[in-house]
């Protein structure tokens, strides 16, 4: 029996849905369609802070394959997993529960595998997780291409040449390490029912799936196989709201860099993943793929020349005081390394 639909932003039709059909490719997009999508995306991110992309061309079978591969990786003995632990130099590799912490008051229950290089040598071995590399690399390439389309759409919307943002993001997932963009595979394991074990109602305050934070980069593309606890604070609000789940869709939201470039016209929403209520949601794991689109390490970018109305009030959650929202230059690598130091144990 299907789980009942929880009250959520998607269920209330409060997240704009953007149709990418007929947009073409990242190399040769349809300019008129890209302009339209850019304006829709700008309107969505400036008013709601997030949007949903449909007809994006990434097959659900590709996502299911990497979800299964991550399950198989998480089932390996710890000594096998340890060979692939995250490299702090390039952010590539396995992040076991507890390594990355956004909420110091709660244990965060998740596994993730960061992919910052498409080299087969950096992936789990074929004999340990068959086809991990064969599944992960094409998906990473698809999400990179989709990110290039989004960058061109945003460029049109803010009044700059589409090549401007492409040039500052030219190194996504290249082997030379000049760009920290990351495809992250995420698995949130099931938790016991609310009346027993850890995460019971009396102890739930000590556990979460992912603590509150805003993403660090330009924007994030997110796929998910179920609702599973994702919540956001809409711009100017202190209220946590469930996002919900639209099968086959990709969520997009701005990161701290895009917020800084646009003087917070396109704000970076604070979000978290909580341990869900209800037996059905708790008994199943949650899988996601997040593609964090970042500028190149040496990109130094001023505020964009927006053709837009005045910015909305800044979000109430603003812990990153080193990020300016004014006409000051911002270095991508410095910002990212600072944020990694704050979140990795």
Walk through the language-model features, giving the residues of each.
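C-terminal flanking tails of non-heme Fe-dependent oxygenases
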Residues: 1-103, 133, 137, 144-345
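Core domains of carbohydrate- and sulfate-ester-processing enzymes
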Residues: 101-111
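A short, charged helix-loop
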Residues: 112-135
